[in-house]
Protein backbone atom coordinates (compact mmCIF):
# COMPACT_ATOMS: atom_id res chain seq x y z
CA UNK A 1 0.00 0.00 0.00
CA UNK A 2 2.85 2.39 0.79
CA UNK A 3 4.33 1.72 -2.63
CA UNK A 4 0.96 2.44 -4.24
CA UNK A 5 0.62 5.74 -2.36
CA UNK A 6 4.15 6.79 -3.33
CA UNK A 7 3.63 5.98 -7.00
CA UNK A 8 -0.08 6.63 -7.53
CA UNK A 9 -1.04 8.95 -4.67
CA UNK A 10 -1.42 11.97 -6.95
CA UNK A 11 -3.63 10.02 -9.34
CA UNK A 12 -5.71 8.72 -6.43
CA UNK A 13 -6.33 12.27 -5.17
CA UNK A 14 -7.42 13.30 -8.65
CA UNK A 15 -9.74 10.29 -8.87
CA UNK A 16 -11.29 11.18 -5.51
CA UNK A 17 -11.83 14.69 -6.84
CA UNK A 18 -13.58 13.31 -9.89
CA UNK A 19 -16.01 11.40 -7.68
CA UNK A 20 -16.71 13.79 -4.78
CA UNK A 21 -19.24 16.14 -6.36
CA UNK A 22 -21.11 13.37 -8.16
CA UNK A 23 -21.51 11.12 -5.13
CA UNK A 24 -22.37 14.02 -2.79
CA UNK A 25 -25.08 15.26 -5.15
CA UNK A 26 -26.47 11.79 -5.75
CA UNK A 27 -26.78 10.87 -2.08
CA UNK A 28 -28.29 14.21 -1.11
CA UNK A 29 -30.83 14.43 -3.90
CA UNK A 30 -31.79 10.75 -3.89
CA UNK A 31 -31.16 9.27 -0.43
CA UNK A 32 -31.50 12.31 1.83
CA UNK A 33 -34.21 14.24 -0.02
CA UNK A 34 -37.20 12.23 1.33
CA UNK A 35 -36.10 13.02 4.90
CA UNK A 36 -35.46 16.67 4.02
CA UNK A 37 -38.85 17.03 2.37
CA UNK A 38 -40.72 15.59 5.32
CA UNK A 39 -38.80 17.25 8.17
CA UNK A 40 -37.78 20.60 6.69
CA UNK A 41 -40.40 21.34 4.04
CA UNK A 42 -43.28 19.52 5.76
CA UNK A 43 -44.44 17.98 2.50
CA UNK A 44 -45.58 14.38 2.05
CA UNK A 45 -42.65 12.04 1.45
CA UNK A 46 -44.39 10.70 -1.65
CA UNK A 47 -43.36 13.84 -3.55
CA UNK A 48 -39.67 13.22 -2.92
CA UNK A 49 -40.00 9.53 -3.76
CA UNK A 50 -41.81 10.34 -6.99
CA UNK A 51 -39.12 12.87 -7.90
CA UNK A 52 -36.43 10.30 -7.19
CA UNK A 53 -38.19 7.84 -9.49
CA UNK A 54 -38.37 10.46 -12.26
CA UNK A 55 -34.70 11.37 -11.77
CA UNK A 56 -33.63 7.71 -11.89
CA UNK A 57 -35.62 7.20 -15.08
CA UNK A 58 -33.93 10.25 -16.60
CA UNK A 59 -30.54 8.82 -15.69
CA UNK A 60 -31.34 5.58 -17.47
CA UNK A 61 -32.37 7.40 -20.65
CA UNK A 62 -29.82 10.22 -20.73
CA UNK A 63 -26.60 8.55 -19.62
CA UNK A 64 -25.71 7.14 -23.08
CA UNK A 65 -26.18 10.55 -24.71
CA UNK A 66 -24.17 12.31 -22.01
CA UNK A 67 -21.43 9.72 -22.37
CA UNK A 68 -21.34 10.37 -26.11
CA UNK A 69 -20.85 14.09 -25.45
CA UNK A 70 -18.00 13.29 -23.07
CA UNK A 71 -16.30 11.17 -25.72
CA UNK A 72 -16.71 13.89 -28.32
CA UNK A 73 -15.67 16.98 -26.36
CA UNK A 74 -13.53 15.47 -23.60
CA UNK A 75 -14.72 14.53 -20.13
CA UNK A 76 -12.12 16.66 -18.35
CA UNK A 77 -12.81 19.68 -20.54
CA UNK A 78 -16.52 19.47 -19.68
CA UNK A 79 -15.95 18.63 -16.01
CA UNK A 80 -14.99 22.17 -14.97
CA UNK A 81 -17.85 24.17 -16.54
CA UNK A 82 -20.47 21.59 -15.51
CA UNK A 83 -19.32 21.42 -11.88
CA UNK A 84 -18.95 25.21 -11.60
CA UNK A 85 -22.42 25.77 -13.06
CA UNK A 86 -23.90 23.20 -10.70
CA UNK A 87 -22.25 24.87 -7.70
CA UNK A 88 -23.61 28.26 -8.76
CA UNK A 89 -27.13 26.91 -9.33
CA UNK A 90 -27.42 24.84 -6.16
CA UNK A 91 -28.23 27.59 -3.66
CA UNK A 92 -30.86 29.30 -5.89
CA UNK A 93 -32.39 25.88 -6.52
CA UNK A 94 -32.82 25.21 -2.81
CA UNK A 95 -34.13 28.75 -2.30
CA UNK A 96 -36.69 28.02 -5.02
CA UNK A 97 -37.89 25.00 -3.05
CA UNK A 98 -37.74 26.50 0.44
CA UNK A 99 -39.33 29.88 -0.33
CA UNK A 100 -42.75 28.33 -0.95
CA UNK A 101 -42.59 24.52 -0.73
CA UNK A 102 -44.83 22.57 -3.07
CA UNK A 103 -44.79 19.25 -4.86
CA UNK A 104 -44.47 20.92 -8.25
CA UNK A 105 -41.47 23.01 -7.21
CA UNK A 106 -39.79 20.00 -5.66
CA UNK A 107 -40.25 17.92 -8.80
CA UNK A 108 -38.90 20.76 -10.96
CA UNK A 109 -35.82 21.06 -8.76
CA UNK A 110 -35.23 17.31 -8.78
CA UNK A 111 -35.40 17.21 -12.57
CA UNK A 112 -32.86 20.04 -12.84
CA UNK A 113 -30.61 18.32 -10.30
CA UNK A 114 -30.91 15.05 -12.24
CA UNK A 115 -29.70 16.75 -15.42
CA UNK A 116 -26.60 18.00 -13.64
CA UNK A 117 -26.00 14.61 -12.04
CA UNK A 118 -26.12 12.95 -15.44
CA UNK A 119 -23.73 15.53 -16.90
CA UNK A 120 -21.30 15.02 -14.01
CA UNK A 121 -21.45 11.24 -13.60
CA UNK A 122 -21.56 10.16 -17.25
CA UNK A 123 -17.84 10.72 -17.64
CA UNK A 124 -16.79 8.98 -14.42
CA UNK A 125 -15.92 5.53 -15.85
CA UNK A 126 -13.73 6.90 -18.62
CA UNK A 127 -12.17 9.57 -16.43
CA UNK A 128 -11.19 7.13 -13.70
CA UNK A 129 -9.86 4.49 -16.09
CA UNK A 130 -7.38 6.89 -17.71
CA UNK A 131 -5.82 8.07 -14.45
CA UNK A 132 -3.92 4.91 -13.52
CA UNK A 133 -1.51 2.64 -15.42
CA UNK A 134 -2.80 -0.83 -16.20
CA UNK A 135 -0.91 -2.55 -13.36
CA UNK A 136 -2.47 -0.24 -10.73
CA UNK A 137 -5.84 0.52 -12.31
CA UNK A 138 -8.06 -1.85 -10.34
CA UNK A 139 -6.50 -0.90 -7.00
CA UNK A 140 -6.51 2.80 -7.83
CA UNK A 141 -10.10 2.99 -9.01
CA UNK A 142 -11.42 0.78 -6.21
CA UNK A 143 -9.62 2.70 -3.46
CA UNK A 144 -10.43 6.17 -4.80
CA UNK A 145 -14.03 5.38 -5.62
CA UNK A 146 -14.83 3.81 -2.28
CA UNK A 147 -13.11 6.52 -0.24
CA UNK A 148 -14.97 9.27 -2.08
CA UNK A 149 -18.34 7.52 -1.91
CA UNK A 150 -17.97 6.61 1.77
CA UNK A 151 -16.74 9.98 3.01
CA UNK A 152 -18.71 12.36 0.81
CA UNK A 153 -21.67 10.24 -0.29
CA UNK A 154 -22.58 7.71 2.36
CA UNK A 155 -21.76 10.14 5.17
CA UNK A 156 -23.62 13.02 3.51
CA UNK A 157 -27.06 12.45 5.11
CA UNK A 158 -25.52 12.19 8.59
CA UNK A 159 -23.28 15.22 8.08
CA UNK A 160 -26.09 17.37 6.71
CA UNK A 161 -28.46 16.28 9.48
CA UNK A 162 -25.95 17.18 12.21
CA UNK A 163 -25.12 20.54 10.61
CA UNK A 164 -28.81 21.33 10.21
CA UNK A 165 -29.42 20.58 13.88
CA UNK A 166 -26.53 22.84 14.87
CA UNK A 167 -27.35 25.76 12.57
CA UNK A 168 -31.10 25.48 12.11
CA UNK A 169 -30.65 26.40 8.44
CA UNK A 170 -32.62 24.67 5.71
CA UNK A 171 -29.88 25.53 3.22
CA UNK A 172 -27.25 23.20 4.68
CA UNK A 173 -27.66 20.67 1.81
CA UNK A 174 -26.93 23.41 -0.72
CA UNK A 175 -23.77 24.49 1.08
CA UNK A 176 -22.70 20.85 1.34
CA UNK A 177 -22.95 20.45 -2.43
CA UNK A 178 -21.05 23.71 -2.98
CA UNK A 179 -18.29 22.54 -0.63
CA UNK A 180 -18.13 19.20 -2.45
CA UNK A 181 -17.86 21.02 -5.78
CA UNK A 182 -14.96 23.14 -4.52
CA UNK A 183 -13.15 20.06 -3.22
CA UNK A 184 -13.64 18.28 -6.55
CA UNK A 185 -12.40 21.24 -8.57
CA UNK A 186 -9.36 21.69 -6.34
CA UNK A 187 -8.33 18.02 -6.38
CA UNK A 188 -8.70 17.70 -10.15
CA UNK A 189 -7.22 21.08 -11.04
CA UNK A 190 -4.20 21.13 -8.75
CA UNK A 191 -2.97 17.55 -9.07
CA UNK A 192 -0.38 16.74 -11.71
CA UNK A 193 -2.54 13.88 -12.94
CA UNK A 194 -5.57 16.14 -13.36
CA UNK A 195 -3.55 18.72 -15.26
CA UNK A 196 -2.15 16.03 -17.54
CA UNK A 197 -5.62 14.59 -18.16
CA UNK A 198 -6.99 18.00 -19.14
CA UNK A 199 -4.04 18.59 -21.46
CA UNK A 200 -4.62 15.18 -23.07
CA UNK A 201 -8.30 16.02 -23.59
CA UNK A 202 -7.39 19.30 -25.27
CA UNK A 203 -4.78 17.64 -27.47
CA UNK A 204 -7.23 14.94 -28.51
CA UNK A 205 -9.86 17.55 -29.34
CA UNK A 206 -7.35 19.56 -31.38
CA UNK A 207 -6.32 16.43 -33.28
CA UNK A 208 -9.96 15.61 -34.07
CA UNK A 209 -10.53 19.15 -35.32
CA UNK A 210 -7.40 18.95 -37.47
CA UNK A 211 -8.48 15.66 -39.02
CA UNK A 212 -11.95 17.06 -39.70
CA UNK A 213 -10.46 19.91 -41.76
CA UNK A 214 -8.39 17.62 -44.00
CA UNK A 215 -9.78 17.29 -47.53
CA UNK A 216 -11.34 13.97 -48.40
CA UNK A 217 -9.81 12.20 -51.38
CA UNK A 218 -11.88 9.76 -53.41
CA UNK A 219 -10.77 6.16 -53.27
CA UNK A 220 -9.13 4.73 -56.37
Give the location of each predicted region:
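Cytoplasmic membrane-interface "Motif A"-like loop-to-helix N-cap segments
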Residues: 71-84
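C-terminal ends and interior cores of transmembrane alpha-helices
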Residues: 84-101
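Intracellular juxtamembrane helix-capping segments at the cytosolic ends
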Residues: 119-132
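A membrane-interface helix-boundary motif in multi-pass transporters
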Residues: 160-179
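A late C-terminal transmembrane helix in Major Facilitator Superfamily
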Residues: 135-166
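Extracytoplasmic gate region of multi-pass secondary transporters
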Residues: 9-58, 152-157
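Multi-pass alpha-helical transporter architecture, strongest
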Residues: 179-208
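Hydrophobic core of transmembrane alpha-helices in multi-pass small-molecule transporters
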Residues: 103-119
Amino acid sequence: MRSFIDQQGDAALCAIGVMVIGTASSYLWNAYMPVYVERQLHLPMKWALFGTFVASSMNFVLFPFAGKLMDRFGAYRLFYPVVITWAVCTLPLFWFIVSAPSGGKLLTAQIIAALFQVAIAAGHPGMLATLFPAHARTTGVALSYNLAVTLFGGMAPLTVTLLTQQTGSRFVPAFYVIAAALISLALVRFTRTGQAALAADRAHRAQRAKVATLPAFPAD
